[in-house]
């Protein structure tokens, strides 16, 4: 091996292999472009984005880490989402979930977690109201 040499695998690297993906149609109803990062809890994305937030609860974009999807005003696009990994605890973002998504923590399904997102998703969160 030479210093700095790359030793690559014979097979391609597949990101998020084995993660069950869903697809959603997203429309940007706003007057400005919206970017959503790779690990953002998609259900809490910008209010100008029109999509099924209940289905998106507990999911993030199926894109490489550190990248983003840009949604132009008036444009509709299809996105692939995969479940959030790790402990599946969501804090921050738009403050619509602010806690665990899984049964061990008292939430029995993504639909239950969505009950926190969907009613408040169209309104201003407590954190946004304080700002």
UniProtKB/Swiss-Prot annotation:
Assembly and binders: Heterotrimer of UreA (gamma), UreB (beta) and UreC (alpha) subunits. Three heterotrimers associate to form the active enzyme.
Record keywords, A-Z: Cytoplasm, Hydrolase
Pathway involvement of the protein, from the record: Nitrogen metabolism; urea degradation; CO(2) and NH(3) from urea (urease route): step 1/1
Catalytic activity as recorded in UniProt: urea + 2 H2O + H(+) = hydrogencarbonate + 2 NH4(+)
Enzyme Commission (EC) number: 3.5.1.5
Sequence segments annotated as region (Disordered): 100-131
Protein name: Urease subunit beta
Record-linked PANTHER family: UREASE (PTHR33569:SF1)
